[in-house]
């Protein structure tokens, strides 16, 4: 069983989410991860965002995974995530700032090991999740999400992963479509 905790402070040079130029934010974050075994992992995170216009947002997130089935080449994990957040005030601003928001999602992750030879391995991963999200003033809507990735563990301790993700989130009552492509290369670890 492993417990990890972290306290972080960040002052990104970039913009606040969806904010016009000139809006910046500072982030304070407390993070706790509990890994009772290789088959279960839970994370709890509390964040506070302080925007340059004086607004403040508090957020609490819980996420976890639990192994449901395994054989030598396929792993199936159940996924769960929940979050709740609130803004200090409900004034009109130029970025996403609901007075109250919450979300719950559940899903499944299927990982197939294509091949493995000593420290080299190729895996592919599919994640499917869905759940309701709530925003004060706009009610609840269901949000689906789908992601597919390739993960390469290279014998020298480095790792390469890439994939595509799709979701249909709702902001201020308007449904959006998000499509993401990502590429990640790391030294000294597995993806």
What is the predicted function of each stretch?
Residues 1-191:
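Gram-negative and organellar
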């Amino acid at each position: 069983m492993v417990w990890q905790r972290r306290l972080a402070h960040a002052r990104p040079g970039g913009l606040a989410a969806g904010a016009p130029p000139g809006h910046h934010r500072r982030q304070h974050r407390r993070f706790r991860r509990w890994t009772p075994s290789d088959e279960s992992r839970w994370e709890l995170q509390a964040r506070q965002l302080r925007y340059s216009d004086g607004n403040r947002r508090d957020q609490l997130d819980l996420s976890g995974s639990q192994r449901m089935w395994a054989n030598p080449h396929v792993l199936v994990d159940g996924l769960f995530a929940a979050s709740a957040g609130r803004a200090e005030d409900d004034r009109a601003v130029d970025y996403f700032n609901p007075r109250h928001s919450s979300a719950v999602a559940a899903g499944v992750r299927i990982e197939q090991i294509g091949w493995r030879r000593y420290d080299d391995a190729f895996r592919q991963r599919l994640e499917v999740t869905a759940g309701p999200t709530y925003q004060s003033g706009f009610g609840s809507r269901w949000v689906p999400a789908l992601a597919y990735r390739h993960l390469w563990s290279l014998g020298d301790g480095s790792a390469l992963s890439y994939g595509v993700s799709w979701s249909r989130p709702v902001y201020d009552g308007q449904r959006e479509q998000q499509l993401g492509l990502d590429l990640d290369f790391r030294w000294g670890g597995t993806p």
